Amino acid sequence: MSNVTFKNDPVTLLGAEKKVGDSAPDFTVLANDLSKKHLSDYKGKVKVISVVPSIDTGVCSEQTRRFNQEATNLENVQILTISMDLPFAQKRWCAANGIDRVDTLSDHREADFGQKYGVIIEELRLLSRAVFVVDENDKITYVEYLSEVSNHPDYEAVLSHLNK
């Protein structure tokens, strides 16, 4: 990803940028109960990986709520929201917002996901907003790195891709 900004200030992304056709690297993150979760735990399903800087901000909150709403119409699709938030904060936020169709996962401990998918904002140690779709065979079929972290992803493009 070349030029990325956060509130119009340039930032540096660390890690390996992913492209359509790449194998999706397995990663280790934490679930809300502090158990380890891996991409491989979702084998056999299409995965939408919705990456947000912090679940407690406006755009991130709207993004997660939107994907939770859309999940009711998606067969054999698992939506994962990954951020650097602590699992406790994610659990509290999900309960307060009625989020029950999205798995919220934390990359705060090792930044393993962020490094492998090229979304760590070096200056902030947050994840840059992005969306990845990974098929049943763990191939990346859709990628959107947002050039301005505070913008919304293209929800319609993601949904159109899933409904092909």
Swiss-Prot record:
User: What S-S linkages are listed for this chain?
Assistant: 60-94
> Superkingdom, according to UniProt?
Bacteria
Q: Which UniProt keywords apply?
A: Antioxidant, Disulfide bond, Oxidoreductase, Peroxidase, Redox-active center
Q: Does the keyword Disulfide bond apply?
A: yes
What's a Gene Ontology MF term here?
Answer: thioredoxin peroxidase activity
Q: Which Pfam families match?
A: Redoxin
SUPFAM superfamilies (UniProt xref): Thioredoxin-like (SSF52833)
Q: What is its EC number?
A: 1.11.1.24
Q: Which reaction does it catalyse?
A: a hydroperoxide + [thioredoxin]-dithiol = an alcohol + [thioredoxin]-disulfide + H2O
Q: PROSITE patterns from the entry?
A: THIOREDOXIN_2 (PS51352), TPX (PS01265)
Q: What other facts are recorded?
A: The active site is a conserved redox-active cysteine residue, the peroxidatic cysteine (C(P)), which makes the nucleophilic attack on the peroxide substrate. The peroxide oxidizes the C(P)-SH to cysteine sulfenic acid (C(P)-SOH), which then reacts with another cysteine residue, the resolving cysteine (C(R)), to form a disulfide bridge. The disulfide is subsequently reduced by an appropriate electron donor to complete the catalytic cycle. In this atypical 2-Cys peroxiredoxin, C(R) is present in the same subunit to form an intramolecular disulfide.
| Function, in words | Thiol-specific peroxidase that catalyzes the reduction of hydrogen peroxide and organic hydroperoxides to water and alcohols, respectively. Plays a role in cell protection against oxidative stress by detoxifying peroxides.
Q: Family, per the entry?
A: Belongs to the peroxiredoxin family. Tpx subfamily.
Its recorded name reads Thiol peroxidase
Source organism of this protein record: Oceanobacillus iheyensis (strain DSM 14371 / CIP 107618 / JCM 11309 / KCTC 3954 / HTE831)
Gene assigned in the entry: tpx
